[in-house]
């Protein structure tokens, strides 16, 4: 058993007041306007970017057609005055009035992906927003290579940038912001690592073991329930989903005790989802290695809460199972008893995530949290409704809106969705308390949210994030997002926890 890689293996992030002798490339920002591009920020780093250097750079950039459009990349030879620097990379930031933290994060990510084979980079982007720039550089440089042999391992000129130095105007500028940004980026990368690890190597017992290693190293309380403990405890949802696999399920609980206010995090941890007896189409089934992205996010967030010493208590309850078809698998038409006693008729074994989440939500409710957030790659309907980059956020109205707002502020773009009362009757069963799916395709994301609501304790502020599309990028890289696991919604979750802690 090997723990998830130490994310300190990402690029080193540092602050500097001067260009060092080892700097290979200087990264600057360009904004666009009708009058041509401008270097941003325009009021800092005059000792490095003197008026003459700025003029020379703008002449060179203009000569090769640089416009400053968002995420545009233009590389030119460094002016002689920038001693030791071989080239300058100008990354587009777009129009100044539209430049925000997320655009800067994306532009920094694009720059980082273009700097493979570079050892040391300096940048002025931190003068705009050092936290956003740092997150963008770190996450844009992310790679996942544990399963590459010497035959396909990255060559020196293919390796991500090793060190990013942020030019700062004073010695203490951005110190705390950079510290937090690196911790956040490392947490996102940890979630990505979990998601990108193939199911041959990340199955429930292994997922639980890796989580335990990380949690104990962070000083968290850890509880792991194996299949026998799950049976004894009556966790019918987790057991039902996992019974078709030769690799039995687990339920992991992590607790960071930082203060009296309690927040429960729940994450769907289906390490591979074939659909079970209601089997999925073979095409693209390999992407179901990502069906534990919700679990990865809440684990990484709980570890991050501890690293940031937030003054609240955060408990993650993470059910882990593999959904496989076999002679022992649950069948369409079976009835199972969830933790807490609710009976559910399983009409579709591919609607399994809600079954394991229901057990976890009831268990988490026994801790009397004030807030409860569950995260899951729950429905294909999320992508039909909102696309692949916009999480659906459901829950109690006030908290749902709060989580969605914060998600938009951090650039993960959660969107508030309703839980229409008229859809609830579609989850009635003729023989049990509930059916796990509605008898039609309409509003599938919302029906799943309504199902989960049945298990949320009364009076708890609750949010449900469906990240089926946003948690895993099957297309080409964009911004600071590469192919595979994205780490969404770690940045949303930690920002929500910080917001709760600040109340």
UniProtKB/Swiss-Prot annotation:
Q: Which cofactor does it need?
A: Mn(2+)
Query: What cellular-component terms does GO give this entry?
Result: cytoplasm
**Which residue positions are annotated as catalytic?**
280, 354
Catalyzes what?
Answer: Release of an N-terminal amino acid, Xaa-|-Yaa-, in which Xaa is preferably Leu, but may be other amino acids including Pro although not Arg or Lys, and Yaa may be Pro. Amino acid amides and methyl esters are also readily hydrolyzed, but rates on arylamides are exceedingly low; Release of an N-terminal amino acid, preferentially leucine, but not glutamic or aspartic acids
Q: Per its UniProt record, what InterPro entries does this chain match?
A: Leucine_aapep/pepB, Macro_dom-like, Peptidase_M17_C, Peptidase_M17_leu_NH2_pept, Peptidase_M17_N
Which HAMAP family does the protein's record reference? Cytosol_peptidase_M17
Q: Which NCBIfam families match?
A: PRK00913.1-2 (NF002073)
**Task performed by this protein:** Presumably involved in the processing and regular turnover of intracellular proteins. Catalyzes the removal of unsubstituted N-terminal amino acids from various peptides.
**What protein is this chain from?**
Probable cytosol aminopeptidase
Q: Which gene encodes it?
A: pepA
């Amino acid at each position: 058993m090997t723990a998830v890689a130490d994310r300190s293996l990402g690029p080193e992030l540092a602050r500097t007041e001067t260009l060092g002798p080892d700097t290979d490339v200087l990264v600057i920002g360009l904004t666009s306007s009708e009058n041509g591009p401008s270097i941003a920020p325009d009021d800092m780093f005059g000792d490095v970017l003197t008026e003459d250097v700025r003029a020379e750079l703008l002449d060179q950039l203009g000569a090769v057609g640089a416009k400053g459009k968002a995420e545009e990349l233009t590389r030119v030879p460094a002016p002689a005055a920038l001693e030791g620097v071989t080239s300058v990379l100008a990354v587009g930031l777009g129009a100044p009035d539209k430049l925000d933290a997320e655009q800067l994060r994306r532009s920094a990510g694009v720059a980082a992906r273009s700097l493979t084979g570079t050892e040391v980079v300096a940048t002025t982007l931190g003068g705009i927003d050092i936290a956003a720039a740092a997150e963008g550089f770190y996450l844009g440089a992310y790679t996942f290579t544990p399963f590459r042999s010497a035959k396909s391992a990255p060559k020196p000129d293919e390796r991500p940038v090793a060190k990013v130095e942020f030019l700062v105007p004073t010695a203490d500028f951005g110190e705390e912001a950079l510290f937090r940004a690196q911790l956040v980026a490392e947490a996102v990368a940890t979630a990505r690592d979990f998601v990108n690890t193939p199911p041959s190597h990340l199955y429930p017992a292994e997922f639980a073991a890796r989580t335990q290693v990380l949690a104990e190293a962070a000083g968290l309380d850890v509880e792991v329930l194996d299949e026998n403990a799950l049976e004894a405890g009556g966790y019918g949802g987790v057991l039902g989903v996992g019974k078709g696999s030769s690799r039995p399920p687990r339920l992991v609980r992590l607790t960071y005790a930082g203060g009296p206010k309690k927040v429960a995090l729940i994450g769907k941890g289906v390490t591979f989802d074939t659909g079970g007896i209601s089997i999925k189409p073979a095409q693209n089934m390999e992407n179901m290695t990502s069906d534990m992205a919700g679990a990865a996010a809440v684990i990484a967030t709980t570890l991050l809460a501890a690293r940031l010493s937030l003054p609240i208590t955060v408990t993650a309850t993470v059910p882990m199972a593999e959904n496989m078809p076999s002679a022992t698998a649950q069948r369409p038409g079976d009835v199972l008893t969830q933790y807490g006693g609710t009976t559910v008729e399983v009409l579709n074994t591919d609607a399994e995530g809600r079954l394991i989440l229901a057990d976890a939500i009831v268990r988490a409710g026994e801790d009397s949290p004030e807030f409860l957030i569950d995260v899951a790659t729950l429905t294909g309907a999320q992508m039909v409704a909102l696309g692949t980059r916009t999480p659906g956020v459901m829950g109690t109205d006030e908290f749902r809106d709060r989580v969605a707002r914060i998600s938009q502020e951090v650039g993960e773009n959660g969107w508030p969705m309703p839980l229409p009362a008229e859809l609830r009757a579609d989850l009635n069963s003729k023989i049990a308390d509930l059916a796990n799916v509605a008898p039609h395709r309409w509003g599938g994301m919302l029906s799943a949210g309504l199902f989960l609501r049945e298990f949320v304790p009364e009076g708890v502020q609750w949010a449900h994030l469906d990240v089926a599309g946003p948690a895993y990028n099957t297309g080409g890289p964009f911004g600071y997002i590469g192919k595979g696991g994205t780490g969404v919604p770690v940045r949303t979750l930690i920002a929500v926890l910080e917001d709760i802690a600040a109340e």
